Design a protein with these regions (language model features):
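Gly/Ser/Thr/Pro-rich low-complexity, intrinsically disordered segments
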Residues: 1-175
Length: 175
């Protein structure tokens, strides 16, 4: 099944598993055993992302304002560039990218504005406000670009990127 693109050991971060129907399944602390359990339950993993953390799980927000977020690889309590993906319903998704740290945007008056990014709590609240059933934080630390319908929405890529999440609509060529 599938093609192996990377064959390295992984840390036990939360994992986002996307099945053949395009549905999201999230495990806290990913392991080969958890993947086997999922597949034994009849869910075939087509894509697995290992970064995290999970932001919304089964419609429940996982981080709340006033709480200190704990997660090993994301500086969760500091504003940073972030990328998140959420599932709103069957084959309905939300992608969010926020630049941060060093990104400057021009203002109409000729000045510039620095993008500060956001915290994990802020990102969680945003994804929950759009009623995501599942939402997951992907790596956004100067390694994300978002293009949509021919337009560029984020270009904070400052290092080589070898991964892509791509959405396409299958349309009947006769219509």
């Amino acid at each position: 099944m599938g093609v192996t693109l990377r064959d390295k050991g992984i840390r036990a971060h939360d994992a986002l598993i996307i099945d053949r129907n395009g549905d999201f399944h999230i495990t806290n602390g990913f392991s080969a055993e958890k993947l086997e359990e999922l597949e034994e339950s009849g869910i075939e993993a087509v894509n697995v992302f290992n970064f995290g953390p999970v932001l919304v799980l089964d419609g429940e927000q996982q981080y709340h304002r006033g709480e200190k977020a704990h997660y090993t690889n994301t500086s969760p309590n500091s504003p940073n560039p972030r990328t998140a993906i959420g599932q709103l319903g069957p084959l309905e998704y939300l992608m969010v990218v926020t630049d941060g740290r060093e990104v400057q945007s021009p203002l109409p008056d000729g000045g510039t504005r620095q993008h500060l990014g956001c915290t994990i709590v802020t990102l969680t609240e945003f994804m929950a406000s759009y009623h995501c059933i599942q939402a997951y934080n992907l790596d956004g630390g100067n390694s994300t670009a978002m293009y949509f319908d021919g337009g560029t929405f984020s270009t904070s890529v400052r290092r080589g990127v070898t991964d892509i999440i791509y959405f396409a609509t299958l349309a009947d060529p006769g219509n």
